[in-house]
Amino acid sequence: MPRAKGERRLEILKALAQMLEAPKWERITTAALAERLDVSEAALYRHFASKAQMYEGLIEFIESSVFTLANRITEDEANGLRQADKLVEMLLAFAEKNPGMVRVMTGDALVGEHERLQARMNQFFDRFEATLKQSLRDAADGDAAGRAATLLRYAIGCLHQYAKSGFSRKPIESFSAQRRYLMT
């Protein structure tokens, strides 16, 4: 029985994400991806017009997953500081559960790819910072923008450290210990 087109696309994206999880990561070629899936490169291009489109699929997964959870947090938690705390924790937990996506989020996997991909990840982080700022608008010190920027930069630093350590330095572990310094 033939597979549905969407099923094969998902299989390709999962394989790409798994390849990005390798601790000693190297740039991924379509030839290596095709070999991993035991298909021809032409078969990949029947589902995606370019490798950039494959990365866009991963970025869409990141955006959809993170902002669905962010919306849930902002709806369920009334306190702005607790919202911000939970938002950062959620982003770090997402990264820990999806190490291949961290390579995309930090831009490592996007080096040498189409520049619109990095621009899209930059937009993702701008949107996440805006979500933090909205949560912190009633913070005691009144500097929602400064607090949001600090929290975002902390989270991005954790993502980089996680990727550079070959995924051994878990971002949630450090956040659990450091949240009291960040959230006061």
What does each model-found stretch correspond to?
Residues 1-36, 53, 65:
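Basic, helix-initiating cap at the start of DNA-binding domains
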Residues 8, 51, 58, 62-66, ...:
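Hydrophobic/aromatic residues within well-ordered alpha-helical segments
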Residues 20-23, 29-30, 41, 51, ...:
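Amphipathic alpha-helical segments enriched in hydrophobic/aromatic and basic residues
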Residues 38-48:
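Short hydrophobic/aromatic patch on the recognition helix
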Residues 57, 71-97, 144-151:
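Hydrophobic alpha-helical connector segments
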Residues 64-67, 114-139, 146-149, 173-180:
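Amphipathic alpha-helical packing segments from all-alpha helical-bundle domains
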Residues 94-97, 101, 151-170, 181-184:
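Amphipathic C-terminal alpha-helical segment
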Residues 95-116:
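Amphipathic alpha-helical segments used for helix-helix packing
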